[in-house]
Amino acid sequence: MLFRLWVFVLLTPCYSWRPWTISDESHCKNGNSENPIVRPGFITFNFYTKNDTRIYQVPKCLLGSDITYHLFDAINTTESLTNYEKRVTRFYEPPMNDILRLSTVPAVKQFNLDHSIQPQIVYSLNLYPSHGIYYIRVVEVRQMQYDNVSCKLPNSLNELIFPVQVRCAKITRYAGENIYTHFFTPDFMILYIQNPAGDLTMMYGNTTDINFKAPYRKSSFIFKQTLTDDLLLIVEKDVVDEEYRFISDATFVDETLDDVDEVEALLLKFNNLGIQTLLRGDCKKPDYAGIPQMMFLYGIVHFSYSTKNTGPMPVLRVLKTHENLLSIDSFVNRCVNVSEGTIQYPKMKEFLKYEPSDYSYITKNKSIPVSTLLTYLATAYETNVTISRYKWSDIANTLQKIYEKHMFFTNLTFSDRETLFMLAEIANFIPADERMQRHMQLLIGNLCNPVEIVSWAHMLTADKAPNLENIYSPCASPVRRDVTNSFVKTVLTYASLDRYRSDMMEMLSVYRPPDMARVAAIQCLSPSEPAASLPLPNVTFVISPSYVIKGVSLTITTTIVATSIIITAIPLNSTCVSTNYKYAGQDLLVLRNISSQTCEFCQSVVMEYDDIDGPLQYIYIKNIDELKTLTDPNNNLLVPNTRTHYLLLAKNGSVFEMSEVGIDIDQVSIILVIIYVLIAIIALFGLYRLIRLC
């Protein structure tokens, strides 16, 4: 019965429409008693075209339902035959050859658990122990959050398909004049691109419930197929070659669909595409022709992530995969502005409840920064999340270990960069105690130095391709805006690597946050100011070529005329005030002696600068051991000369010049020296008396 209704609705536009009335009487006009045109309980429709007349009869009960009114609202019964014929030929019809793409067998390892294993419920998540490893069924935590109301699909589809009642998640992004909107449902994904030259709709997934209006047929829009899913392409044929050239060369689409069921392979593809986009300098360019491809792959990644590979998987692997997913979210959000909507996986939020005492469910490897990983997952949620003090303590220890490992100018590893990327995202986006925020920004920013810049340049040419996380450099820290194009050029020119400067500056522009809202003392600083900020526990130092902020300032006088260094100290809890003049001044003090006992200069920063090139690097000193290592002449870490100088920016806001005398730390305190001298004098006096007695 429903089939007959569909036939009627589909054929209505074909044969035009005539007014109709419902009658319970039988009429035999143009018929006979054995074949009546109208019968009780039925509605007769007469369609006329030239000399041809077609008659359809539909039970009246069907036309009185809500769905009938819904369907009639979706069709234009007054359209002329001329307009109807014109729009039939308007759309691009993909070639029939090479439509079928047989998905390869996923290479991802499939984990099969013994069905007799009983789950352990940990914070509402079912975990399955097997051979010392805990597993979780992916389907339990990868469910995308869909809106509670029915999704309103793109208006451009109204002409072609009947309305679809389905819940979805929706996110919209802008790139110049183009608008990119993703619709995610449990069965299919839609990428809708609004372009002044012509729109494009790409629909992928199980399209069984998508019904096209006459004269269109679904088969006319199928661009590619797998064994289970369709990729429909809806675009006017006049704009395909002009705006969407990747459609003509379907290699990109084919390669994507080859791995459509393998989430980790798709994540790898997107990482490679993202790195290429960065290295070409195309990120944030509204006219970049590759954005439609990026948006298509992005949609496929999220759709496959939320619907494929639903079986058991080790908990750590689930978390690491989600980490990778969030990193591509972060990258896309940086490249293409988000205007509306989010994509969230609410069940993943349950992992945020795990404390260090629960980490054995995730991994027994103590070297994995689990607290950092879990807190990084929290950056996906718009609402404030609460991170326990135990996690913050663990995060601080992780950062401190990385800093101590590389504070004296050693190369960061891929693993270190990945962890620093997560730590930087946490520092930039997760609310925390201000002291913690300041400390994280300080340590991450201080890992940027000339050695890191050269190492980063070499990494871009390494055989092992980086991903969107481990390509991160601490030079992208918001407190290191002094890492400018001219500074990078100076460093790379010395190393004969200046050809990579544009790539590095592009990456810095993408990964560096637009402001410093998390550190109140410097939140008023303009992002365009080439300043370095050092948020110490009790004071913040800003090093800049001009006056940029209210505080106690000091001008370095040893530099050449073309190089200006102004150091401004801002006391803790001071209101940030942007200024272009000197507010208050202080003198440069000379450091003559450093005690190794009381460590007056711990929690301070040693700054190296060049008379010509300006500030070069900063080293935060936490304890006396680090200070001894730094100033030990045998380590050659501080090598003053006629051009290179060192300043100590103290925790109380004072600035000291570290002379050659001051670089050598006294290994004993002055009091002990006095005691030793007194003992020696007494001993000599006793020896003298003894000799006299003899």
Curated annotation (Swiss-Prot):
InterPro entries: Herpes_gH, Herpes_glycoH_C, Herpes_glycoH_C_sf. Residues 174-234 are annotated as: Interaction with gL. Residues 693-694 are intravirion. GO terms for biological process: fusion of virus membrane with host plasma membrane; symbiont entry into host cell. The chain crosses the membrane at residues 672-692. Glycans are attached at N51, N76, N148, N206, N337, N365, N384, N411, N538, N573, N593, N652. It is found in: Virion membrane; Host cell membrane; Host endosome membrane. N-glycosylated, O-glycosylated, and sialylated. Residues 1-16 form the signal peptide. One of its GO terms (cellular component) is viral envelope. It is a single-pass type I membrane protein. Keywords: Fusion of virus membrane with host cell membrane, Fusion of virus membrane with host membrane, Glycoprotein, Host cell membrane, Host endosome, Host membrane, Membrane, Sialic acid, Signal, Transmembrane, Transmembrane helix, Viral envelope protein, Viral penetration into host cytoplasm, Virion, Virus entry into host cell. Its main location: virion. Interacts with glycoprotein L (gL); this interaction is necessary for the correct processing and cell surface expression of gH. The heterodimer gH/gL seems to interact with gB trimers during fusion. This is Envelope glycoprotein H. It comes from Human herpesvirus 6B (strain Z29). The gene is gH.
